[in-house]
Structure formats: C-alpha cells, structure tokens
Amino acid sequence: MLNGITSERLLEQRFGGKNVVYCVAQGMDAVKLGGALTYTVMGQLCIGVPSAEKLPALDAVCALFDRIGMPYSREDDILHRLWGKFMLNVGVNQVVMVFEGTYGTIQAPGRPREMMIAAMREVLELSRYEGVKLTEDDLNFYVELMNTMSPKGMPSMRQDGLAHRRSEVELFSGTVCRLARKHGLSVPVNEWLYARVREMEAAY
C-alpha cells in the first residue's frame, strides 16, 4: 500500500482503472523495527470505489474479506475518507518524525500537537479547492483517533527516520505544497515540515 492521495491513480496507470479498489488503512499502531512487528490496535481497512463501474471489483474484495475475517469498512464516499487519512498523515507522520518522538508526543499538549493540528488544517482548507470539502468534524475525528493510539507507538515516517530510509514526505507535504501552489494558497506549516524532513534525510 501507498499513503497519500495520488497512490490510487498511480496504481490505475499500471493495472487499469477497473482493477483498483481504493483503500485506506487506519486505526492501527503497528511498529516494525528490524524484523519485529508489534501492535496493540489492529485497525481496519476502509475500502470503496469512486464510480459505479468499479463496483464488481469492490464486491469481490468485500466477499474475500468476509471469508477471511479481515476487519474492514465499506465506504460510500471513499475520496472523502482518502483525504481524511491524508490529512491525518500530513499532521501525525511528519510532526512525529521531525520531533523524533512517538504518538505520545502529539497526544500531550504542546508545540508538536499544535503543529500537527495546524498542518492538518492546511489540508482541510486545500480539500475545499479539490472538491472534497473536509470539515472541522473530520479534523476532530482524526485528532481523537490519535488519542487512542499507544503512546509508545510511532507512525511510519518516524520508523523511516530511525532506519535512515527515505520517507513519504513527497506524498504528504510535497503534495500539499504542489496543490497549494496550484490554487494560490499559503501552507507555511507544511512548507516548514517539508524542508525540515529533507534536511534530516540529507544528514543520513
């Protein structure tokens, strides 16, 4: 799986539009360090399709998940869910990496939590120009979701930083900055996060 709001289009270019079911994985706090994978919350897959021509593929995936007992939610508006998860990742992943922390870092009051919410709010504003229209209720939902994570857990970008791997920053603040330029919007928090992550990666 790829995070962000461009991944499904990339997959459609490779595998054909009718063969790609849109998916968002959310609610898990898995951490993979070396060969060890740990989690306290399994989460679920949110799946859906943006058009009726893809419904047969969605039905097939739902049937498979029912057979194997995979936790999932069938979404009526998968694009809204995709953007919601994007908003979450832009805030949580990047801020925890930059502050070299854990979920506990953004669960506690302070600058990291404030920066997370500010970065998310820039995505909320941007979504309105992209026809998705996230709301404050969406933002609050994802902030509360983060409060349920293990304080000792960490998102994928922080794990990338610890392993000195290239991160998903282009999929997150990179995308935000590109779309903001397209619409003439100001996104100073994401611009700072992008520059800081690139600086950290250059020091590996």
Map each language-model feature to its residues.
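NAD(P)-dependent Rossmann-like dehydrogenase/reductase catalytic/cofactor-binding core
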Residues: 56, 66, 115-204
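Rossmann-like NAD(P)(H) cofactor-binding subdomain of soluble oxidoreductases
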Residues: 1-36
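Short glycine/serine/threonine-biased micro-segments
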Residues: 2, 33, 41, 46, ...
